Amino acid sequence: LFFSGIRYGNLRAGFPDKGAYSAQSSLEELKQKNCKLMCFCGIASPDSFVGWVRQSFPEAPALIFPDHHQYKASDLEKIHSAFERLENGNKCIITTQKDHMHLKNNPLFEALTPYIYYIEIDIHFVDGQEDVFNKLITDYVRNHTKNAAMARSQH
């Protein structure tokens, strides 16, 4: 039995060529720049993400969509309206890497691209069991695939 978790990493500008404040940032840096921000996500367990944002920005509005959500024009209008309601000044939108990937080529999202940041995540194993897990998977594949001989020769 293995236990894993998510660690939040850096904030990355979703569209660094569109005028973001910086290509890479942190919530603390955005706080120092006196940014007003909101967040949105469409993930299975949004509480962790929203809680992470609200540790630094307790008043940040959050829009929550269902997991694997296919964003429509009406959803993007909700995001845009929430963004417009933020106080004037430096404004940012924080989302997940998954949601950024869903929206990055959506032309309806174009107006918000200079303000979008997404959070990088890292999956980690509790008690440093990553090597044990990887060996278990590699050994299984090596011994239980049609191409077991090829798998053995590559490792």
Ranges and model annotations:
Residues 1-155:
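ATP-dependent carboxylate-amine ligase
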